[in-house]
Design a protein with these regions (language model features):
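An acidic/histidine-cluster motif and surrounding catalytic segment
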Residues: 77
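Short loop/helix-cap segments at secondary-structure boundaries that form the rim of catalytic
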Residues: 130-138
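Short acidic-hydrophobic, aromatic-tinged amphipathic segments that line or gate anion-handling sites
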Residues: 86-89, 140-145
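Short, well-structured N-terminal submotif of metal-dependent ribonuclease cores
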Residues: 1-50, 63-72, 130, 143-147
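Active-site neighborhoods of divalent-metal-dependent phosphate/nucleic-acid chemistry enzymes
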Residues: 2-4, 84-126
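Conserved glycosyltransferase catalytic-site signature
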Residues: 17, 52, 110-114
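Histidine/lysine/aspartate-rich catalytic loop segments that bind and position anionic ligands
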Residues: 54, 81
């Protein structure tokens, strides 16, 4: 999938946890694709959304291994990056995530991410979770499929 075509007409983009991990930790597997997504969203002034649970998912491993520098790097990234908003889990998001879990058999974190994307009006969802492609209410963009 060509990124510029996949994001054509997208004004609100949701980014799942894994792209933030690849980017912040400079993980080579999908770093080029993630950098391209961030560059595209910044150049095209696309509102980018993620959930507050993203920070929790990102810092769990660094906390486990006492990597306070990496924890701080994540916190700085989410506080200072332009055009990226963190959305709290509301009652509506929680209820919608339950519907998604019931309909698609999603794990709770995945359902919360997708529910947040839907409730905030996102047209596309960037992830590396191939299993999420079964969700039909939203355009699911897989990092591993981007060129």
């Amino acid at each position: 999938m060509i990124l510029s075509q996949a994001l054509l007409g997208v004004h609100h983009l949701y980014i799942d946890t894994s792209p933030f991990i690849y980017y912040t930790e400079n993980r080579p597997e999908f770093l080029a694709q993630v950098k391209a997504v961030f560059a595209y969203q910044e150049i095209n002034n696309i509102d980018t959304i993620t959930s507050v649970i993203t920070l929790s998912e990102c810092v769990t491993k660094p906390l486990k291994v006492n990597d306070s520098l990496l924890v701080s790097a994540y916190e700085r990234f989410f506080l200072k990056t332009r055009n990226i908003s963190m959305t709290p889990v509301t009652l509506q998001i929680s209820r919608r995530s339950a519907d998604l879990r019931a309909n698609y058999g999603l794990r709770t974190p995945d359902a919360l991410h997708i529910a947040t994307a839907l409730e905030t009006g996102c047209e596309a969802f960037v992830t590396n979770g191939v299993s999420l492609k079964r969700v039909k209410e939203l355009s699911i963009l897989i990092l591993g499929e981007m060129i």
